[in-house]
Amino acid sequence: MKLAVYGKGGIGKSTTSCNISIALARRGKKVLQIGCDPKHDSTFTLTGFLIPTIIDTLQSKDYHYEDVWPEDVIYQGYGGVDCVEAGGPPAGAGCGGYVVGETVKLLKELNAFYEYDVILFDVLGDVVCGGFAAPLNYADYCIIVTDNGFDALFAANRIVASVREKARTHPLRVAGLVGNRTDARDLIDKYVEVCPMPVLEVLPLIEDIRISRVKGQTLFEIAETQTAVSYVCDYFLNIADQLLSQPEGVVPNELGDRELFSLLSDFYLNPTSNSEKNANISGLEPDSLDFLIV
């Protein structure tokens, strides 16, 4: 199974990806996480340091693939999760999609690409071009990390559009949304009501998730000494269980930009209207209510 994790820049994709990878490993799967970001920091919380990138290694070998060995590019991280960083072209030059393609090509040359039960691609920020949508060419499922805010859901909607485009020629589906570090989910629920897709999990707004990234440790590793964090790991184990059940997934139809803007802004600008809609759905007339608290 191959997974591609997308979401708005800074939403917490790498932290989420690392913990999902460990959760899958805890379920007995052999897992490879591939960081697809020029910052090459996707696997930092698994390995504890910035590992050399595929591009750096290929450059040092003058792009002689036959001179590259698995141990040159694959590093084992916490929980037995193997880690690879694709890296990227210099700032302002080159194409990130090319780098992803070179990474997959090299792993195939090393007979490593098909040795894993699960390969997880952790992809940088919003989908801004076809190049950064390249991991979708290899994925069975796309996981979209969001929060309960407009910007993250706007980015999620653009990612949905990319999935729909790729699904024309690839057996690709959206596995679902993961809400990251949010106490509320009203906008998430509003979005999936209009653009139906599963919500795999909504992670609580706790500092331990943010701090784990700064520490360079996953929540599973922190939980070994801080048992109070253990309950958060259960969220990721639940995500892993859903993914391993090989869900049908969906190919949603994205909303138009203005339609999405109106949908989400109207939710707060016209709360009474939304309450009336909810009352009608439940079979109640708004006038029959004794009072309404907004």
Curated annotation (Swiss-Prot):
Membrane spanning stretches? none
Co-factor(s): [4Fe-4S] cluster
Asked if the Swiss-Prot or TrEMBL record annotates the protein with the keyword Metal-binding, the reply is: yes
Name the pathway.
Answer: Porphyrin-containing compound metabolism; chlorophyll biosynthesis (light-independent)
Gene3D superfamilies listed in its UniProt record: P-loop containing nucleotide triphosphate hydrolases (3.40.50.300)
Its EC top class is oxidoreductase
Q: Which reaction does it catalyse?
A: chlorophyllide a + oxidized 2[4Fe-4S]-[ferredoxin] + 2 ADP + 2 phosphate = protochlorophyllide a + reduced 2[4Fe-4S]-[ferredoxin] + 2 ATP + 2 H2O
This entry carries the following GO cellular component terms, namely: chloroplast
What biological-process terms (Gene Ontology) are attached? light-independent chlorophyll biosynthetic process; photosynthesis, dark reaction
Q: Where in the cell is it found?
A: Plastid, Chloroplast
| E.C. numbers | 1.3.7.7
Pfam families (UniProt xref): Fer4_NifH (PF00142)
The residues listed in the UniProt record as binding [4Fe-4S] cluster, with positions renumbered to this chain, are 95, 129
InterPro entries with a match to the protein in the record: NifH/chlL_CS (IPR030655), NifH/frxC (IPR000392), P-loop_NTPase (IPR027417), Protochlorophyllide_ATP-bd (IPR005971)
- Per the record, the major location class is plastid
GO terms for molecular function, please?
4 iron, 4 sulfur cluster binding; ATP binding; metal ion binding; oxidoreductase activity, acting on iron-sulfur proteins as donors; oxidoreductase activity, acting on the CH-CH group of donors, iron-sulfur protein as acceptor
* Cofactor binding description: Binds 1 [4Fe-4S] cluster per dimer.
The record lists ATP as bound by 10-15, 39, 180-181
Q: Which UniProt keywords apply?
A: 4Fe-4S, ATP-binding, Chlorophyll biosynthesis, Chloroplast, Iron, Iron-sulfur, Magnesium, Metal-binding, Nucleotide-binding, Oxidoreductase, Photosynthesis, Plastid
Task: List positions binding Mg(2+).
Answer: 14
Q: Which NCBIfam families match?
A: DPOR_bchL
Quote the subunit structure annotation: Homodimer. Protochlorophyllide reductase is composed of three subunits; ChlL, ChlN and ChlB.
Similarity annotation: Belongs to the NifH/BchL/ChlL family.
Function (record text): Component of the dark-operative protochlorophyllide reductase (DPOR) that uses Mg-ATP and reduced ferredoxin to reduce ring D of protochlorophyllide (Pchlide) to form chlorophyllide a (Chlide). This reaction is light-independent. The L component serves as a unique electron donor to the NB-component of the complex, and binds Mg-ATP.
- The protein depicted here goes by the name Light-independent protochlorophyllide reductase iron-sulfur ATP-binding protein
Please tell me the species this chain comes from: Pleurastrum terricola (Filamentous green alga)
What lineage, starting at the top, does this entry show?
Eukaryota, Viridiplantae, Chlorophyta, core chlorophytes, Chlorophyceae
Name of encoding gene: chlL
